[in-house]
Amino acid sequence: MSSLPDFCGLWIFAVFGSLGAASLGSFYVTLGYRILEYDYGKKRKILSFREKWRRIFTSPSACDHCGKEVRYPELLPVVGYLITKGKCKSCKKDIPKFFPIVEFLFVCIFLFCFLITKNLPFSFVFLFLCGHLLISCLTDARYFSLDYENLPWIFCFGMFSVFLLNGKIPGINEVYVFGGFFLCFIALFFLFPGGIGFGDVLFAPVLAMIAGHPWWMFFLNASYVPAVLFTIVFRKKGSSIRKTPIPMGIYFSLGILLTFFCKILFNADLLPFSIFSELENPNL
């Protein structure tokens, strides 16, 4: 009986946290699409820097097709999509399924992190990192471009997530990881022109540093193995894999996401990796 209040409290936090996670997912997917519209689209050249960001953050949600403003309860994450049956009430055009999918995934990520770690601050801060990774995925998928303005946010929320999860900030080993990745990627950038973008040179070392030592090895494989496999499967017939552009922002984001998931499971003794145990705890 003594564990009942703790059990109830856990699920109360889980329920209300899920609502916050869905709202955060809705915010970031909307932010990502607005950045595509105002920072990469035609409006980029006709609006001042200040006006552009004012519209990105303050413009009311509206249908992409007819411009009709969306109001509650249609604005509610996931639920709003079900209420409208996936169509705009004004023009009857389809609402992208990507919106409710992202909102639902944010809830799933929050529940996974919170129910395993019981660490509410980490579970929420990690969602902010996921939101900025989502923006990188959207810009790279659409324009093969990684937004440099997004990188400081990824670094800050990534470092904060590591601190909240591990209880300590990255140390000298992570600095070495950053330096090693940067030197390797900058060498590849100059030795093989057109092979990788400069965004990869900047993003990969930061994400590897967030992954930490020895998890950078997992991050590297979790990024490049799917990238190569998906490129081989989905490239145009007859085209060379070397000449096929790869949106590495998507795969780097997937890699760091999987790295955090595995670290969470590893810390909870649900995913034993003997080699990582020895590297992280050399005295054992």
Spans of features found by a protein language model:
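A membrane-topology feature that recognizes alpha-helical transmembrane segments
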Residues: M1-L284
